[in-house]
Amino acid sequence: MEINGVEIEDTFAEAFGIKVSRVLVTAATKKLAKIAATEATGYGTSVIGCPAEAGIDCYVPPEETPDGRPGYIIMICNPSKKSLDHELLERIGMGILTAPTTAVFDALDDEDEKLNIGFKLKFFGDGYEKELEIDGRKIHSIPIMSGDFLIESEFGIKDGVAGGNFFIMGDSQASALLAAQAAVDAIAAVEGTVTPFPGGVVASGSKVGSNKYKFLNASTNEKMCVTLKDEVEDTQIPENVNGVYEIVIDGVDEEAVREAMKEGIKAACTVPGIIKISAGNYGGNLGAYKIKLHDLF
């Protein structure tokens, strides 16, 4: 299969189940909301080494938020319900409560269950906290130096999908990077998904474990390193490829991840110099979801 002359390899992305939350962060201005959303989703690229996977889903205009202010929906994900509960409390408490003019609301419509994050955080008010109702939502109002911080009492979580992915192979590092950025921009329009790596782009693909060091849980994927293509016997890098980037996607469900992969691949294939699109998997032995690239189109 080809798209705009770019080979789409007949392979699949192997994705995994993960617990997902969606949190709406509002503030007095779009800029302030973006700052808080960015802070709360930091250090959230992969649960290989981070305490959560997190990213910004989408912007929400004032006319669509409970308090009539601009906001951003973020997603925070973790395989463990207990760990996700902890991460929500920590990231909202340290990344959003501390940010100027912010408020926080649940943004997950079809939750499997709810966690009482706002109820727990209200105790920061040290007895001065109050209970309100906004747009039919139970809200805790916590007095802070600049006014009151508002947070919804409960936040929904559900079973989502993590690790949807594809590799972009270009004739140069520059072409592959431009295509990766185009892919991330396209995926940003797919609601219910995030690309949790820096700028949405993975530069250092990894494999499980190590060939040499027993103490490592993960190490560089030498088969996908362009500078090793003449050194590694079973390299997966074509001779004319000199730049590779990976896009990893987390979503509220498989359908959202599939749509994001499709739109991202289509966008990547519009960039000159892109030679091939592939995907990462573990032979189908680890992940519950096997997303075939050809089936996306």
UniProtKB/Swiss-Prot annotation:
Keywords attached to this entry: Acyltransferase, Cytoplasm, Methanogenesis, One-carbon metabolism, Transferase
GO biological process: methanogenesis, from carbon dioxide; one-carbon metabolic process
Annotated metabolic or biological route of this protein: One-carbon metabolism; methanogenesis from CO(2); 5,10-methenyl-5,6,7,8-tetrahydromethanopterin from CO(2): step 2/3
Reactions accelerated catalytically: N-formylmethanofuran + 5,6,7,8-tetrahydromethanopterin + H(+) = N(5)-formyl-5,6,7,8-tetrahydromethanopterin + methanofuran
Enzyme Commission code: 2.3.1.101
GO molecular function: formylmethanofuran-tetrahydromethanopterin N-formyltransferase activity
Enzyme class: transferase
Compartments, record wording: Cytoplasm
Principal location: cytoplasm
GO CC terms, sorted: cytoplasm
Family statement: Belongs to the FTR family.
Subunit details: Homotetramer.
Function field: Catalyzes the reversible transfer of a formyl group from formylmethanofuran (formyl-MFR) to tetrahydromethanopterin (H(4)MPT) to produce 5-formyl tetrahydromethanopterin (5-formyl-H(4)MPT) and methanofuran (MFR).
NCBIfam families per record: one_C_fhcD (TIGR03119), PRK02114.1 (NF002554)
Protein's name in the database: Formylmethanofuran--tetrahydromethanopterin formyltransferase
Provenance organism: Methanothermobacter thermautotrophicus (strain ATCC 29096 / DSM 1053 / JCM 10044 / NBRC 100330 / Delta H) (Methanobacterium thermoautotrophicum)
